[in-house]
Amino acid sequence: MLTVLLLVAGTVVIVRSHLAKEQVKRDAAYAAAEEALNPIKQEEIDALLAGQGKALKERDEKAFLAVYDPANKKLVDQQTVLFRNLSKVPFAEATFKRLGGGSAFRPLGTGASVNHVVAFVHKLDGFDLHPVDEQYEWTIARSERGGPIKVTAVKGITADRGAFSFYPAPWDKWRNIHVERTEHTLFIVNASLKAQAQRYAPQAERAAVANLAAWRDGGVAGEIPQGFVISLVKGKKDLGSLYRTAGETPPEAGTSYGVPSFQDINAPDDQKAPLVGGSRVVIDLATSFFEPSEPNGPGDIFRHELAHSMVAALTDQQEEDTLVPRASWLTEGFAEYLGNERKPWTDSTRTPAVKRSLSSGYALGLKDEFNMKNAESANLAYWCGHSAIGYMAEKYGEQKTFEVVAEHYRGKEIKDVLPEVLDVSYEDFYTAWEKYVKAEIR
């Protein structure tokens, strides 16, 4: 009996040992198959990205650069510049996140490489209402099986994000940035423009305070920023290549961008962020606003561009949504109204030139889109928009005027907003405005 039991026990041990060996073989085969299909796991990439955010927060340059291929000197230099620039910026949040599943794997030695879209998710302390993002394409490689993963290439994404890609940001564009902060403004400029940032920061601060006070006095509901991010550039080339890659020379003296909030696709719908999380202003110093003969010029353009930035946060439709395009006469007229310090629109510096245009055959009109390629037409269009907002404020009051602006930014058409807020049709408003303007400038 004892012999039988011993034989059975021995058989069980042998069977278990055989099964264990077979399981090891199956596990190894499964692991090999998984590695062949997925040689660089998303968990590894996420851990690498988390480490980048940690290194930036701790100002650990060595750790930040450790993930990049040391053989690629240009890449290491690029990322060294980026790290040192980012370290100067007051971020409330700054993390790197993987977007999507990445490209197909490509063989590399005994390993593989893959491309991933990486979002630099950030929130400027005191200036952004919600986190925003800038997107890059990273090439991540493992040159040999079992070896570490390294980043071998990084490039900014400039396509598929509408008119403005939000790349390159100042920290990408310039080797050395200067950051100048006031209570309500944050200048991020090329270090070569440090003196100009320091010179104009007080004027921008006064412009921000004036605009915020005007909006507050209007009593319109809605979350707006209490600070504004500004970059100064010299010339149209830089104006058209910061936060965007302009195909043509930009005609404007300054631009304000509403920056989309970073949207976590895994978040519940009731936790989705508003469409616009912040704004960025870029102003060209090589324009008449900054000539010695125009002492009020800097304040005028700061108030104008910050007016756009202030109400951008109210946006409640996608930027590329063409169902309710914004009427330029209203948005630019509002910016001109605040830019002119809410003074009578007839005091506008554009008025003398407009009178000449009208006497030479141009006509009054409220244009939904300005012809920026025709300077005389554009000047008249800005002036007409300004006069319309001035008329609206004079007849209906600033609060109603600001409500019209807010509702239009929230996605309502002008033809619907005017009856709703002012109890007047667009056609009747236009007729009354035109009659009013002709009487004022005759």
Language-model regions, residue ranges each:
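Second-shell loop/turn segments in exported
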Residues: 35-39, 51-53, 186-202, 285-297, ...
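A short hydrophobic beta-strand element
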Residues: 108-123
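Beta/coil-rich, acidic/histidine-enriched accessory regions frequently appended to metallopeptidases
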Residues: 1-24, 73-76, 81-88, 376-380, ...
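Juxtacatalytic substrate-recognition/specificity segment
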Residues: 181-320, 414
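Short solvent-exposed beta->alpha transition segments
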Residues: 61-110, 418
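Acidic/His/Gly-enriched intrinsically disordered linker/tail segments
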Residues: 297-301, 306, 316-398, 402-442
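Short beta-strand edge/turn micro-motifs at domain boundaries
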Residues: 23, 122-176
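Short, low-complexity N-terminal intrinsically disordered segments enriched in polar/charged residues
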Residues: 3-58
